[in-house]
Regions:
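Well-ordered alpha-helical segments embedded in enzymatic catalytic cores
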Residues: 23-30, 84, 163-166, 233
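N-terminal small/polar loop signature for handling phosphorylated ligands or for N-terminal nucleophile
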Residues: 33, 46-109, 198-233
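Positively charged, low-complexity intrinsically disordered leader regions
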Residues: 1-28
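Gly/Ser/Thr-enriched, mixed-charge loops and adjacent short helices
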Residues: 1, 14, 110-233
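Short strand-loop junctions, especially beta-strand C-caps/beta-turns
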Residues: 11, 50-52, 117
Length: 233
């Protein structure tokens, strides 16, 4: 097994090479172990995922690990942007947010991004501790973990509407809707599908939103990677 190495926000790996069900399970157990040992509030976690290959399935796998050790888990019902998960962690007062995503990397990658109760990246010491746990676990220990009865409470959530309401409370949306502008919106086959349209939608609005790459495709065709840089726009 390749060594699991954490970067600034979490761990990323090549799908089917080192980012596998076995390694995701080991990493998930290590995160769960850290939460049980270090976070005394036990306020639950939120698990999200993006539109990449297997992201939803990996999110379900990690959720089951958390449940098996008694961690209440909120699992999103659709691919969700990381800032939305972060906002939901704060509003619900959860211990942590875990997102299955490789951010702007190309289609061959996936990853596990972590956010603390304040919506921030975990500090280096915390990540080092989880990394150390990840590389000390064996496959047999993970199998034993799945043999237990689920003990945590699973709640499925859809945080999109609440997040859009938060944005509306921060911006003069009614004035923006009167601006009579046309917006070209590139969703890059990702998690923002429908967000801008929903935010600005109103029968009296004069804004036109023209969206492209407005469907899920984990291959991210015609772009190098899902990142708003000049070569992709």
């Amino acid at each position: 097994m390749k060594k699991i190495t954490f970067g600034t926000d979490g761990w990323r790996g090549l799908i089917a090479d080192d980012f596998t069900y076995q390694n995701v399970g080991i990493c998930g157990w290590s995160i769960a172990s850290y939460i049980k040992e270090s976070l005394i509030n036990e306020r639950g976690v939120i698990v999200g995922y993006d539109t990449r290959f297997g992201s939803k399935e990996f999110a379900i796998q990690i959720s089951n690990i958390f449940l098996s050790v008694g961690i209440d888990t909120y699992l999103v019902t659709e691919p969700t942007p990381t800032p939305v998960i972060t906002s939901e962690v704060i509003s619900r007062g959860c211990d942590m947010g875990i997102i299955i995503t490789a951010s702007h990397n190309d289609w061959k990658w996936n990853g596990i991004k972590l956010r603390n109760s304040k919506g921030l990246s975990l500090d280096k010491e915390e990540l080092n501790l989880i990394e150390k746990k990840s590389n000390a676990r064996s496959k047999d220990e993970i199998i034993k973990l799945y043999s237990g009865k689920l003990k945590g409470l699973l709640t499925e959530i859809s945080p999109k509407d609440g997040y859009l309401e938060l944005i509306r409370s921060k911006l003069p949306i009614s004035e923006i809707r009167k601006s009579d502008i046309k917006i070209l919106n590139d969703n890059m086959y990702g998690t923002t599908l429908g967000y801008l349209e929903s935010l600005l939608d109103d029968s009296n609005s004069s804004i036109i939103v023209d969206s492209i790459n407005n469907y899920i495709n984990p291959n991210f065709p015609d772009i190098i990677r899902p990142e708003p840089i000049e070569i992709n726009l």
